[in-house]
Amino acid sequence: MGFGSDLKNSQEAVLKLQDWELRLLETVKKFMALRIKSDKEYAYTLQNLCNQVDKESTVQVNYVSNVSKSWLLMIQQTEQLSRIMKTHAEDLNSGPLHRLTMMIKDKQQVKKSYVGIHQQIEAEMIKVTKTELEKLKSSYRQLIKEMNSAKEKYKEALAKGKETEKAKERYDKATMKLHMLHNQYVLALKGAQLHQSQYYDTTLPLLLDSVQKMQEEMIKALKGIFDDYSQITSLVTEEIVNVHKEIQMSVEQIDPSTEYNNFIDVHRTTAAKEQEIEFDTSLLEENENLQANEIMWNNLTADSLQVMLKTLAEELTQTQQMLLHKEAAVLELEKRIEESFETCEKKSDIVLLLGQKQALEELKQSVQQLRCTEAKCAAQKALLEQKVQENDGKEPPPVVNYEEDARSVTSMERKERLSKFESIRHSIAGIIKSPKSVLGSSTQVCDVISVGERPLAEHDWYHGAIPRIEAQELLKQQGDFLVRESHGKPGEYVLSVYSDGQRRHFIIQFVDNLYRFEGTGFSNIPQLIDHHFNTKQVITKKSGVVLLNPIPKDKKWVLNHEDVSLGELLGKGNFGEVYKGTLKDKTPVAIKTCKEDLPQELKIKFLQEAKILKQYDHPNIVKLIGVCTQRQPVYIIMELVPGGDFLTFLRKRKDELKLKQLVRFSLDVAAGMLYLESKNCIHRDLAARNCLVGENNTLKISDFGMSRQEDGGVYSSSGLKQIPIKWTAPEALNYGRYSSESDVWSFGILLWETFSLGVCPYPGMTNQQAREQVERGYRMSAPQNCPEEVFTIMMKCWDYKPENRPKFNDLHKELTVIKKMIT
């Protein structure tokens, strides 16, 4: 089996094979070039990450930490990995890619040689087997005619007896020519037969076998290139494996049980001597009737002691019940953690248990505090019981002998004594009414304040599912607070408070069907918030946060989900579906929804558009009607713009749109962008697809999902993100620097889209090709039928230096003049 024996008549197939392989090699070459670029960028990114890490922060001056050592080694090994990846990229460029480029040239030469030789031998074969034989046959037929003609003339001459010799000579000559040509034809025919046999049996098979041999040699070479590529790009080479081994070894050296031994040794302090708490005997210097550490039982205190004893007994019982409940909760949580630990598939899954473990430790602290309270109550109760039992059945002795005192004082003094007695009696009465205040009980009195049955969403301080950042911006003074639904965990509620210069966020716990922070539980969130607001009870003892000023939501923009009816699906956006809908008053609207399973940062970006649009009111900016953030999913309600997106509009109506209308569209966008520029708003995604066509063909700028409002008019973005490359200015692509000037560049691209009637910019180029061409100075040519004045504006917008681009005010003026010029 081979080319020579099986592909004698498959010239077209061989050529197609060579063409296909050349295209394949070009694809491989392009792939390798992109891989080299990708690896270089990856190496640069790794190095950049390491440079951004403050290595000094990982070094403790007086504390040896294995975690710190491990982290520092991770950074060092990541730098090493960066160097390895860079070296690999360079080796890939100088090795496989260079050889592949040479191989492509050689393969092109092989094809060229094959085509040339095949054409040559095929032409020779046709010449020998067809062309020359046809010439001989044609001459053969002619000479037969000439011979027959000479023969007839010779016969006529014989019959007439005239010029016989001359006619005979002509006849002999014609016969000789024919016989000689006959011999030539016989020889040529023999040669043609042999040539054809040689062509099909030897010459052509030899050529095809030669091609096959070179094809196979190139496959062998390509295999070698692939092998080099595989080895160079392998992520399991010894040097890369060693990097990860070093990291793994450093991680394994982390021992949680000994991590803080050195820290303890360095910062160890001697135990402070406990302060002795004793009765201050100086209090008794002016009174002889009271005794240190003795409960006074007399006619003034007997009743109150009974009440205090009863209260302490109740408190002790309540504390013991709570203690049993907490201890059971500790055991239950320990069991749950143990079960969860057994199901962990990865070591890092332990992170998922940290919250439960922290809750367990807090429970244990609560148990210890309750035990302390139990011991304190038991000791106080025992002291009271001892005194009461000692005097059981006895009549309480009087404190003061009034008859004796009456003989030694005046009537005025008696009144003063009686007044003092009354004050003492009233004080004791106060003690009897609130014995816990005397005993310093740690148990809190559950004082539930009725707040009605209004749903949570109807309370002004409830802001729904607004982002954490937006909530923080609303909190400005001590005690400012609001409640919101967690963005990251729908269904979980958070109290956000400004306290002591910080914005604090407390998750509202829901346990045993009660809402609480760490104290009293309530059946709903409004009761919980109202209790802490009215009583000024701290949210947690550790934080000491007190609620002072409820921050009301902006009712102008807030709508309830029930106020909106969803209609037909209009399309899908970056964050979720977009629906047509109506408000209660039948106003048609567009409803943007946010998927509930989106990452937290994308949900924040979703609401960023509404936050920006709240501030704007302009006929060429799409209007915000409101937001529904009271529950998930979150909605943004916009005005319904009936004409749809501008890009689709251009493509559908391209045959009927006049030049003046296109200039009007451009003027509308310029007016809208001029307004945004005055508000220091950077759109960052200006394009035909992000504009909407309203009534009377008024164009409105939409889709502010990437927009930013910056006081300085410049926004810096870092990180790898999906950006509209063909619409984005070079400085934004290269350095993440966005400004009104970068919006002007995008406006120039939008102008090109408008006057090309919806053609994609940089036609025939990929994003990367367009980016590279722009860097080299390339700019798109004018669309067909585009006015020269408009194309001049485009070129101004595409100036490489941002400071040289026109302002939107200038663009608006120039387009106004152009509009007047066009009839």
Swiss-Prot record:
**Could you tell me which residues carry Phosphoserine?**
434
Q: How is its activity regulated?
A: Activated by phosphatidic acid binding. Activated by hydrogen peroxide (in vitro). Activated by reactive oxygen species (ROS).
Return the annotated region ranges for Important for interaction with membranes containing phosphoinositides.
Answer: 1-300
- Please list where the region (Disordered) is annotated: 389-408
Give the function comment from the record: Tyrosine-protein kinase that acts downstream of cell surface receptors for growth factors and plays a role in the regulation of the actin cytoskeleton, microtubule assembly, lamellipodia formation, cell adhesion, cell migration and chemotaxis. Acts downstream of EGFR, KIT, PDGFRA and PDGFRB. Acts downstream of EGFR to promote activation of NF-kappa-B and cell proliferation. May play a role in the regulation of the mitotic cell cycle. Plays a role in the insulin receptor signaling pathway and in activation of phosphatidylinositol 3-kinase.
Which family does the record claim for this protein?
Belongs to the protein kinase superfamily. Tyr protein kinase family. Fes/fps subfamily.
Official protein name in the record: Tyrosine-protein kinase Fer
Organism field: Mus musculus (Mouse)
